[in-house]
């Protein structure tokens, strides 16, 4: 049952237990009439809902509750090269509220990539973005709530144990993760490979290597398994397929540099202490 609801949006709050208050914000922008045009995909909280969110945070503060924020769009830029339309438009104002009321944890989505960012500047919030369940490797998060901390661990859903005997005869269903991986890798690299084949059709092996590299770099970023050693990253950057790729597609140069992480940071698990 909702503790409170915003009359001007779909936002609401729920007191989970004696320690935590869940604040579920509505960052979507809705059309006012039917249209054949593409919908707005960027997000905004708006002044009215920001006041409502502050009301929830203040309630949590007054009742010794720890607020946890949920919304579709992102609080932080999880990729320095690609973030326009993903970070909520009024993130500055929302981050200011998170800092004022010591909001330590937020969950969001939209980018379809598994990514965790810790506190930024004066904002104490750790933001967890869980990858899209219907693509990549069917990732989902397991959140355990304790009196003095919250843990998050990314898992993979294995549906084979739930298949009927008839469904187990279906190769795609039994090997569904392979199906999703092949689909994702193919769709990511298809356009780039096609443009390369039009120009360099005499070196199909190089084009195939470029497509394979481009696909895997993206795949690793989107499922959060993008932490590698600096020596491995240097090897990738020195490879012929990488060098030709950024030469022919300079628009990818900065983006590709953001996909791997050589630090000890994890995008798969985190512990928030209170």
Name the predicted role of every residue range.
Residues 21-23, 36-126, 186, 229:
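His/acidic metal-ligating clusters that form di-metal
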Residues 4, 85, 133-136:
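Acidic-and-aromatic substrate-binding clefts and catalytic sites of carbohydrate-active enzymes
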Residues 125-196:
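A post-motif C-terminal structural segment
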Residues 28-51, 59-61, 65-70, 75-77, ...:
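Active-site-proximal loop/helix segment associated with metal-binding centers of metalloenzymes
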Residues 164-274:
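Non-catalytic terminal accessory segments
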Residues 27-28, 73-74, 109-111, 131-132, ...:
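Active-site metal-binding loops of divalent metal-dependent hydrolases
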Residues 1-58, 121-128, 139-142, 150-153:
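Extended active-site neighborhood of metal-dependent phosphoesterases/phosphodiesterases
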Residues 31-33, 76-79, 115-117, 135-138, ...:
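Short catalytic/ligand-binding loop motif for oxyanion handling, primarily in non-cytosolic enzymes
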């Amino acid at each position: 049952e909702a503790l409170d609801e915003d009359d001007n949006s779909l936002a609401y709050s729920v007191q989970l237990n004696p320690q935590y208050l869940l604040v579920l914000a509505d960052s979507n922008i809705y059309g006012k009439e039917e249209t054949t045009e593409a919908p707005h995909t960027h997000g905004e909280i708006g002044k009215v809902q920001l006041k409502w969110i502050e009301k929830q945070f203040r309630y949590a503060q007054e009742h010794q509750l720890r607020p946890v924020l949920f919304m579709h769009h992102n609080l932080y830029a999880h990729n320095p090269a690609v973030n326009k339309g993903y970070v909520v438009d009024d993130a500055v104002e929302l981050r200011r509220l998170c800092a004022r009321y010591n909001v330590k944890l937020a969950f969001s989505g939209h980018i379809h990539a598994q990514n965790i960012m810790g506190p930024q500047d004066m904002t104490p919030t750790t933001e967890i973005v869980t990858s899209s369940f219907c693509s990549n490797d069917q990732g989902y998060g397991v959140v355990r709530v304790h009196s003095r901390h919250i843990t998050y661990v990314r898992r993979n859903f294995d549906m084979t144990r739930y298949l009927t005997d008839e469904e187990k005869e279906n190769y795609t269903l039994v090997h569904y993760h392979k199906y999703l991986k092949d689909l994702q890798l193919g769709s990511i690299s298809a356009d780039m490979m096609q443009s390369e084949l039009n120009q360099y059709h005499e070196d199909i092996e190089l084009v195939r290597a470029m497509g394979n590299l481009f696909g895997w770099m993206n795949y690793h970023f989107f499922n959060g398994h993008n932490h590698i050693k600096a020596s491995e990253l240097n090897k990738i950057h020195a490879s012929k397929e990488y060098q030709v790729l950024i030469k022919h597609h300079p628009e990818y140069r900065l983006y590709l540099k953001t996909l791997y992480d050589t630090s000890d940071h994890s995008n798969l698990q985190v512990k928030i202490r209170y």
